Amino acid sequence: MSKIRVLSVDDSALMRQIMTEIINSHSDMEMVATAPDPLVARDLIKKFNPDVLTLDVEMPRMDGLDFLEKLMRLRPMPVVMVSSLTGKGSEVTLRALELGAIDFVTKPQLGIREGMLAYSEMIAEKVRTAAKASLAAHKPLSAPTTLKAGPLLSSEKLIAIGASTGGTEAIRHVLQPLPLSSPALLITQHMPPGFTRSFADRLNKLCQIGVKEAEDGERVLPGHAYIAPGDRHMELARSGANYQIKIHDGPAVNRHRPSVDVLFHSVAKQAGRNAVGVILTGMGNDGAAGMLAMRQAGAWTLAQNEASCVVFGMPREAINMGGVCEVVDLSQVSQQMLATISAGQAIRI
């Protein structure tokens, strides 16, 4: 089997050296070339035709975002961004994902060599995922048409969504058309700390419903979406007649924290048939068991179809496990989940 050919673009000679060490330490991939800036990278891409590009966000001569935008227009290819953990870095990274980057890696703030080498397995996994990703499904999405406001629903009704690779754009596409009359939404997207708040703030500006990073103990309200904070699990709990959010530092589940399974299992227990579960694009099997639990508790469950997924991993696993009632294209998810949740009477659990 041929190796995954990687080209790394970074203005730091140390980072280029570290990325080369990491990539070449895995038997199924090789670093074919490195470039100090996008202008050099342009020629090397033509020469080496890599399978995956790793791209630093902030560089001299040409900004990483400008280069990414041109690359996706002229020669689309899988790109993994390398970003700093600053607030500005997280906003730029989210913009890169919007432009077509498949995923991102965050640079450690201290001890960069030791930190990056400790990330070796994670970086290799992201490169493998990017090499297999569907670029057709990851074209920048146009703004979806706003859905008409429906009747106000019982606060017992809610929607739970899980996603990973490719999920930031898929979630935007699902939330943007939702009217203020929508039920509450609880969302787990695999993301490191520092990025979930920027992600929520970005969505809040784009959507009619309120979107925020979830906080422990807060009441779950209709017309709002709550994003699980990075590196912390989010669960649905009850406080008397109301739903509330529980945030905790339990062990990683399916190697993830936050975990989609943790959210879905709690929704199955607390909301049962009053919920709709949605699993979107992502690598691995996180959410499959939880979605089955939701279906068995009476919830209606949706999975994004393969044609519209950047990575058809999590939806496939959920389908194979028997947890999915319906498979739909990303363009239909918002409409379908609202129609489904509006159909049945709320049952007090």
Curated annotation (Swiss-Prot):
The protein's matches in CDD domains, at most eight in alphabetical order, are given as: CheB_Rec (cd16432), REC_CheB-like (cd17541)
The answer on whether this UniProt entry bears the keyword Cell membrane reads no
- Catalytic center residues: S164, H190, D286
Instruction: Identify one Pfam family in the record.
Output: CheB_methylest
Which EC main class describes this enzyme? hydrolase
Post-translational modification comment from the UniProt entry: Phosphorylated by CheA. Phosphorylation of the N-terminal regulatory domain activates the methylesterase activity.
Modification 4-aspartylphosphate, positions? D56
Any keyword Membrane? no
Q: What Gene Ontology molecular function terms does this protein carry? A: phosphorelay response regulator activity; protein-glutamate methylesterase activity; protein-glutamine glutaminase activity
- Keywords assigned by UniProt, alphabetized: Chemotaxis, Cytoplasm, Hydrolase, Phosphoprotein
Q: Where in the cell is it found?
A: Cytoplasm
Task: Report domain CheB-type methylesterase positions.
Answer: 152-344
Instruction: Output the InterPro entries linked to this UniProt entry.
Output: CheB-like, CheB_C, CheY-like_superfamily, Sig_transdc_resp-reg_Me-estase, Sig_transdc_resp-reg_receiver
Can you list the GO cellular component terms from the UniProt entry?
A: cytoplasm
Chemical reaction(s) catalysed: [protein]-L-glutamate 5-O-methyl ester + H2O = L-glutamyl-[protein] + methanol + H(+); L-glutaminyl-[protein] + H2O = L-glutamyl-[protein] + NH4(+)
Q: Give its E.C. classification number.
A: 3.1.1.61, 3.5.1.44
The biological processes this protein is annotated with in GO are: chemotaxis
Q: Domain Response regulatory, which positions?
A: 5-122
Could you tell me what this protein does?
Answer: Involved in chemotaxis. Part of a chemotaxis signal transduction system that modulates chemotaxis in response to various stimuli. Catalyzes the demethylation of specific methylglutamate residues introduced into the chemoreceptors (methyl-accepting chemotaxis proteins or MCP) by CheR. Also mediates the irreversible deamidation of specific glutamine residues to glutamic acid.
Domain notes for this protein: Contains a C-terminal catalytic domain, and an N-terminal region which modulates catalytic activity.
Family per record: Belongs to the CheB family.
Give the protein's recorded name.
Protein-glutamate methylesterase/protein-glutamine glutaminase
Taxonomic lineage per UniProt? Answer: Bacteria, Pseudomonadati, Pseudomonadota, Gammaproteobacteria, Enterobacterales
